[in-house]
């Protein structure tokens, strides 16, 4: 197995009030040789073995990117749109497109206000709306595949994905105190 790639980052103060920061990771994550063991219900308990070569490592997207737009309209107030893209990921090491988590893009909205006082050094009020567009996507899961002969005696492969959905639009408020 091997992993190789490159990561690029950009931070820019566009104006006094507007900042952009982003990054992208491009990678190749490969398994040179992989043996898939699959339950065979015709000879259960028994297994079939399928050999794979040069496949993608599971849960290792080839592309991950973020782009954040921060606006500072007045002193101590920050408003931001935070965007994250994650490329396609496989549930196992077979690189089978039917055993994958689709790529996704999510956008969050954040407001951050800071107050300075004599008693408390810093009071930070935060409000975040996660998944602003209510995108339906998965972030994790697993696959179960088995083989069994059909009514004609032909061996068939059956595969099921079990995916963990991400939260729909939700929010968080926070208060941080520094003494």
Label every PLM stretch briefly.
Residues 1-93:
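Gram-negative outer-membrane beta-barrel transporters
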Residues 2-4, 59-63, 103-107, 167-171:
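Residues that define the transmembrane beta-barrel architecture of outer-membrane proteins
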Residues 37, 96, 141-143:
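Short, glycine/charged-enriched secondary-structure capping and boundary segments
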């Amino acid at each position: 197995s091997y992993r190789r790639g490159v990561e690029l980052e950009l931070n820019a103060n566009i104006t006094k009030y507007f900042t952009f920061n982003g990054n992208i990771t491009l990678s190749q994550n490969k398994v040179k040789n992989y043996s898939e063991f699959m339950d065979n219900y015709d000879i259960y308990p028994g297994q079939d073995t399928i050999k794979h070569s040069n496949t993608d490592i599971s849960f290792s997207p080839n592309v991950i990117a973020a782009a954040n737009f921060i606006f500072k309209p007045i002193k101590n107030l920050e408003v931001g749109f935070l965007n994250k893209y994650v490329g396609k990921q496989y549930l196992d090491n077979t690189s089978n497109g039917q055993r994958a988590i689709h790529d996704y893009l999510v956008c969050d909205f954040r407001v951050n206000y800071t107050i300075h006082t004599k008693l408390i050094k810093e009071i930070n009020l935060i409000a975040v709306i996660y998944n602003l567009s209510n995108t339906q996507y998965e972030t994790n899961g697993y696959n179960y595949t088995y083989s069994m002969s059909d009514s004609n005696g032909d061996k068939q492969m059956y595969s099921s994905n079990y995916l963990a959905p991400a939260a729909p639009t939700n929010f968080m408020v926070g208060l941080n105190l520094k003494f």
